[in-house]
């Protein structure tokens, strides 16, 4: 079993699935998850340990980009505790044949762990605008489909920004999550994570205040109906008796003010919005549970049957709206009913196998 960062579906073929793994890299299935094979042909050996993300071109079948790294388990402190993240190896690679083969696409982008990649779907087909998070170096932008990259850190503090995730709103705003670099009980301002917004396609960034006391932001999602409604997830920080300032937070005014929506002792990695029913939200925590809300986070119900200790991210199954995938830290990927099973005594979710065709 291993950690995984996402389950992604080919927009032209929902049975063509990719899983982003640590330690074994990127795996693909052509039959809806019945069989799996490695998708690493052409990836430099020093990049193959971990795939952090995959992005598809929605208008060109077979065209996709991947975020690769020789270092796993980011953004956890154990990975950069003894050395600078700028010594990590990794980069962006492109595939034009649906992941059967890859080619590095790193001109202007230093060899570094790339942890996220975002495509602007409004950019010209054939010359796509892409954004990449380089851990320890910041944000990079390409306006030629990833052939060349330029650093875009204007307004981002620090010499080694732990750029982690980048999200786009319906109004064109970009939000950047910078991971926390402090650990234990030492959370100085210099070691806290951060949230930034850009309204000019990453040319300039402005700091968005985090909720009071929050130092470990992990993800940000935007309501597809309201660009001012933001959901922020966070890992708690060590307290005297329990962790604090973690969980889920919501802002209805673009980040000016925040309200807690979930237990603040929790380590919540990410939040998923159901695009068909945006009032429905999903999260997973470090308490052997995943949760579902149907009222925009006002109330949460445990997804009965899922009980792996370290939950990661919930992904909706496009082949069956009643089912979900749940990625984990160390427990592979799980698949089961979105609403859970009230009669389950133990797990009703089954692990997705990783087997060569």
PLM feature spans:
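Extracellular glycan-interacting surfaces
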Residues: 1-357
């Amino acid at each position: 079993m291993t950690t995984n960062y996402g389950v992604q579906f080919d927009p032209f073929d929902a049975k063509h699935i990719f899983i982003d793994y640590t330690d074994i890299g990127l795996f693909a299935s052509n039959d809806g998850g019945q069989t799996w094979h490695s998708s690493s042909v052409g990836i430099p050996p020093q990049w193959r340990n971990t795939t952090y993300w995959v992005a598809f071109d929605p208008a060109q079948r077979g065209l996709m980009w991947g975020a690769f790294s020789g270092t796993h388990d980011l953004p956890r402190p154990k990975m950069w505790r003894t050395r600078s993240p700028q010594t990590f190896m990794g980069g962006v690679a492109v595939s034009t044949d649906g992941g059967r083969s890859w080619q590095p696409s790193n001109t202007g982008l230093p060899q570094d762990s790339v942890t996220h990649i975002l495509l602007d779907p409004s950019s010209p087909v054939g010359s796509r605008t892409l954004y990449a998070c380089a851990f320890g170096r910041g944000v990079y932008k390409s306006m030629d489909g990833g052939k060349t990259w330029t650093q875009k850190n204007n307004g981002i503090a620090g010499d080694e920004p732990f750029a982690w995730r980048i999200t786009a709103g319906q109004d064109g705003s970009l939000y950047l999550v910078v991971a926390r670099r402090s650990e234990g009980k030492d959370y100085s301002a210099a070691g806290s994570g951060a949230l930034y917004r850009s309204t000019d396609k990453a040319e300039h960034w402005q700091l968005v205040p985090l909720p009071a006391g929050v130092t470990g932001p992990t993800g940000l999602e935007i309501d597809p109906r309201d660009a001012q409604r933001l959901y922020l997830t966070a890992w708690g920080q060590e307290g005297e008796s329990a962790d604090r300032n973690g969980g889920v937070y919501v802002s209805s005014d673009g980040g000016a003010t925040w309200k807690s929506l979930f237990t603040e002792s929790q380590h919540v990695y990410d939040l998923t919005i159901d695009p068909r029913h945006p009032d429905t939200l999903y999260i997973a925590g470090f308490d052997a549970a995943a949760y579902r809300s149907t009222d925009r986070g006002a109330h949460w119900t445990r997804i009965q049957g899922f009980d792996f200790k370290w939950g990661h991210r919930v992904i909706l199954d496009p082949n069956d709206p009643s089912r979900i995938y749940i990625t984990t830290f160390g427990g592979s990927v799980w698949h089961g009913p979105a609403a859970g099973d009230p009669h389950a005594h133990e797990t009703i979710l089954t692990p997705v196998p990783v087997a060569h065709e």
